[in-house]
Amino acid sequence: MKIETPNPIKILIYGEERIDFIQNIITNDILSESKSLYSYILTPQGKILFEIQINLMNDCIEIICSNDQSDLLSYFEKYAKLSDISLQKFQLDKANFGESYFLDSLKMGKIDTNFLPHSTLNPSEVHDEYINYQKGCFVGQEVVSRIKHRQLQKKNILIFEKINQNTLNLPDDFELLIEFKNFLVLRLPKNIEYLNFESELGLRKV
């Protein structure tokens, strides 16, 4: 895989209703004690649309998206019509979100879903910690809550590092999402035992 030219952006949200505005959209809870957190924005069908970093500033909310695939500003503008807020968008330096950024993320075991095909991803398959199931309504909330409480999640998305150069023969129920350098991002059956991957497949979980 080659990392295509990313589209990193920053959006600043101003206005008295900025907290309520973003709280009703994101999967995480901006009312927590943290001044900085990660979250997803989902489709109504509960699939990942954006992964964002949220920073609470004195007079605004800073939203950072490492690779804006679906026009985050237009998405916010659609929901902002009835809110007392204003939006400002800035392009970020692409050099900070290229191959080195992506490789460092994989080494740390972090999957930046902004570089994956969003339309097929359930958020709980990747970073379940980006979802607060107690916070109340947000876009896609009914779907992800049903998956959680009825234990309907069947897959996990994990990072593995190749420990040899042997030809890789993955089982049929493994889905390769990304192969980058010596790293693979795989979607696997949830309860699969991967402790023997080193000897059987030459893969080590990151």
Give the ranges of each region predicted by the language model.
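Basic, glycine/lysine-rich polyanion-binding surfaces/domains
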Residues: 1-206
